[in-house]
Amino acid sequence: MGRFVAVALLVLLSLSGLETIQHAPKIQVYSRHPAENGKPNFLNCYVSGFHPSDIEVDLLKNGKKIEKVEHSDLSFSKDWSFYLLYYTEFTPNEKDEYACRVSHVTFSTPKTVKWDRNM
């Protein structure tokens, strides 16, 4: 019985330690297909490698939040870091700028990554 209690305590201590670990998210912004002006596409923001799981992600058009955005379920990797995909339909053109803005405890201010149509 004592051995079980010791093992259970060790597991609980290990899990509680995960909350103190913080990893900044890696942010990747890309389109599903190569960009062509006037041709519908999907804008993706893949956020990965972050911990803890609390995060806010916005897709932006000319600095303003895009309202019709979908996202995957929050998932985690084998190292217990988390990842998400946010995406929306869009039609690229020469004048509009697109970006992904992420707020996470590891950032003092939200981080914005612009979409590069050549990537």
UniProtKB/Swiss-Prot annotation:
Signal peptide: 1-20
InterPro entries recorded: B2Microglobulin, Ig-like_dom, Ig-like_dom_sf, Ig-like_fold, Ig/MHC_CS, Ig_C1-set, MHC/Immunoglobulin
GO cellular component, one term: MHC class I protein complex
Record keyword Secreted present: yes
Ranges of residues in domain Ig-like C1-type: 25-114
Name under which the protein is recorded: Beta-2-microglobulin
Chain's gene name: B2M
GO biological process: antigen processing and presentation of peptide antigen via MHC class I; immune response
Localization in the cell: Secreted
Result after altering R3L: In strain: Isolate specimen 1580
Pfam families xref list: C1-set
UniProt subunit comment: Heterodimer of an alpha chain and a beta chain. Beta-2-microglobulin is the beta-chain of major histocompatibility complex class I molecules.
Cystine pairings recorded for this chain: C45-C100
Record keywords: Disulfide bond, Immunity, Immunoglobulin domain, MHC I, Secreted, Signal
Biological function: Component of the class I major histocompatibility complex (MHC). Involved in the presentation of peptide antigens to the immune system.
Protein family (similarity comment): Belongs to the beta-2-microglobulin family.
Gene3D superfamilies reported for this sequence: Immunoglobulins
